[in-house]
């Protein structure tokens, strides 16, 4: 018994000594209940408590995994993986496990959101332009599709690019950022006629409404929990990307939520309780309503050390 306890202690010491604090975490998304955050680091998907702590590695393939998206009930995660060449959609339990492949086209597919009922995953891909499309047919200009979570045939939702989709609770409307041209999405302080805007799409009427319509970059919209306002990322005010907010009844009245100066805020998401999550300078942050940003401490143990065998 003493030998077993000693062995366990040695393993714990080994794990703690090899834990690292990762930088440049990407694709962060907070869970619907606000308790956990998934993120990508060096091509794998991890999960960490929203209060900080040890990160659990969910994928261990030699391929590149990215863009994790929570299901509305927080029990599943959809993500993109290039394990078969191009990026395809996969879905796995939120605690990790066997991933099921959902898409099989040769084009790369990037997940954006689940429908509120949890039955479909929406994704962007350049698969099929309609005959009446006015867009130049190129792989850089995607269409919006959905695929059943249970697997099956994909269906085109929009023939125009619609990225970072976010549904309201009713499922009748969703927000998205557009794409008008081929400008590098990582370019800073871009101003032109092809910068991204935030749009509202009514699924009942098919109406698109431009909510920001300006020369600078506005992107990554998310609904507030009550559905009356929108949080988004913008480079307005001659600064780096920060979090902003406007009421849907008055989208021209925009207020700043964060005021970071040196680096851009990326990968905005929100929980059902209104906790914001994003990355800044390669690290994770959360922010409660009417509160200051809080850095999330992340301890990451490489998977080779988590598979140690006791003597």
Q: Which residues make up each language-model segment?
A:
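Sec-dependent signal peptide recognition
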Residues: 2-7
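Hydrophobic h-region of N-terminal signal peptides that target proteins for export
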Residues: 10-18
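A flexible loop/linker signature enriched in serine peptidases of the S9 family
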Residues: 20-22, 40-46, 54, 59-65, ...
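Short N-terminal segments immediately surrounding and downstream of signal-peptide cleavage
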Residues: 21-34
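Conserved beta-strand position repeated across blades of beta-propeller domains
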Residues: 29, 69, 113, 166, ...
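Short, acidic, Ser/Thr-enriched surface-loop or helix-capping motifs
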Residues: 31, 40, 71, 93-94, ...
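Short coil/turn segments that connect the beta-strands within blades of beta-propeller domains
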Residues: 33-35, 73-75, 117-119, 170-172, ...
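Periplasmic/extracellular electron-transfer cofactor-ligation site
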Residues: 49
């Amino acid at each position: 018994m003493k030998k077993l306890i000693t062995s366990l202690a040695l393993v714990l010491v080994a794990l703690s000594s090899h834990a690292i604090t990762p930088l440049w975490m990407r694709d962060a998304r907070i869970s619907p209940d606000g308790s956990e955050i998934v993120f990508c680091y060096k091509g794998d998907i991890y999960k960490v408590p929203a209060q900080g702590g040890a990160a659990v590695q969910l994928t261990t393939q030699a391929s590149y995994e990215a863009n994790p998206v929570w299901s509305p009930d927080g029990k599943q995660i959809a993500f993109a993986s290039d394990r078969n060449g191009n990026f395809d959609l996969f879905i796995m339990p939120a605690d990790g496990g066997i991933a099921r492949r959902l898409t099989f086209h040769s084009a790369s597919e990037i997940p954006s959101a689940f429908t509120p009922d949890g039955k479909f995953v929406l994704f962007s891909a350049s698969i099929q332009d309609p005959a009446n499309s006015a867009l130049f047919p190129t792989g850089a200009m995607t269409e919006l599709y959905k695929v059943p979570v249970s697997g099956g045939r994909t269906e085109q939702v929009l023939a125009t690019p619609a990225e970072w989709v976010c549904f309201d609770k009713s499922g009748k409307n969703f927000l998205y950022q557009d794409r008008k041209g081929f400008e590098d999405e990582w370019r800073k302080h871009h101003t032109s006629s092809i910068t991204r805007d935030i749009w509202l799409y009514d699924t009942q009427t098919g109406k698109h409404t431009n909510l920001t319509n300006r020369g600078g970059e506005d992107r990554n919209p998310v609904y507030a929990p009550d559905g009356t306002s929108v949080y988004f990322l913008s480079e307005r005010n001659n600064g780096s990307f920060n979090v902003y907010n406007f009421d849907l009844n008055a989208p021209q009245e925009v207020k700043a939520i964060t005021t970071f100066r040196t680096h851009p805020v990326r990968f905005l998401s929100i929980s059902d309780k209104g906790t914001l999550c994003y990355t800044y300078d390669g690290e994770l942050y959360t922010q409660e309503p009417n509160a200051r940003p809080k850095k999330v401490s992340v301890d990451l143990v490489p998977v080779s050390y988590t598979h140690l065998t006791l003597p």
